[in-house]
């Protein structure tokens, strides 16, 4: 599958299109074929390693000391369930979904992404396009949790 990856921090030019292995869902995971994703301020800050001075050490430990620990950015996405693990009951192949990748180690800039069944993943509202659904994830989660 194709993915946009980065192996060092820096300007947008550090992003590269690469061929990587397609993930296989484990027994409790859902494999999503990505139809839409976004570019958030979080993605830009992770890519460039532009963080507030007081958070520098924590950010380096979380994101990667010498280079990105998680090479595929993308904090939100929308797509279609392609496969499910053996014990998954909430989702079926063909379900349209939208999700936050924050708790799933990012990865929205890839053609496929695995999520735990109990992750931040929900059925996409029928009245939203995949692009609209992907763009509503972080704002919607913020509204729900505040």
What do the PLM-derived regions correspond to, one by one?
Residues 1-2:
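Extreme N-terminal starter segment of soluble prokaryotic enzymes
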Residues 6, 82-83, 114-116:
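Short beta-strand-to-turn element immediately C-terminal to the catalytic PLP-Schiff-base lysine
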Residues 9-10:
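Proline/serine/threonine-rich low-complexity linkers at boundaries of modular beta-sandwich domains
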Residues 17-19, 112:
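Well-ordered beta-strand positions in beta-sheet-rich domains
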Residues 21-38, 50-103:
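Glycine-rich beta-strand-centered segment in the early N-terminal region that forms part
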Residues 42-48:
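Cytochrome P450 core scaffold surrounding the K-helix E-X-X-R motif
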Residues 63-76, 90, 99-146:
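NAD(P)H dinucleotide-binding glycine-rich loop of Rossmann-like/cofactor-binding domains
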